[in-house]
Amino acid sequence: DEELEAIRSRVLHMGGLVESQVRTALAAFDKGDLDLAQQAIDADRRVNDLELELDQMVIHVIARRQPTAGDLRMIIGTAKSIMDIERIGDEATKIARAVKWLHEKGAGTRMQRVPDIQHSGEIAVSMLRRTLDAFARMDVAAAAAIIKDDRGVDDRFRATLDPAWLRAFHH
């Protein structure tokens, strides 16, 4: 169980880094701040390194311990969570790179015109925090509620990222 606890602890650490990375990327977007954008981009390397470390830990536990069905389900679920957390970090990096690109194109001052980006980002960060809390407590009911909420956030984000506002950056 020490190995499983070590994995859980590292996943929570990785999640905290990604939460900070997303907050930094959103702040960079909101302010048009290139330094914050670079910080979010730089954080991606640490997140990717943690993903590789955690993948090795998971493989080691499966190979060495031959976990019971219950532990194996938890380990596989954790492995999927690791991939999802890393992907969230990749999305934060994309936001930060967009800030740099928009600045290069002279659209840095127009970023505030993008409807609902900051609000949608805050909702996503809140969901990530709730997910990490549910993971830390192994709270299945909380996780199920987050999955339900996620569907609404996806719809809102798609509406926010409508191509119409993208054209505003090209005028």
Where are these regions (language model features)?
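Cytosolic, long alpha-helical scaffolding segments
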Residues: D1-H171
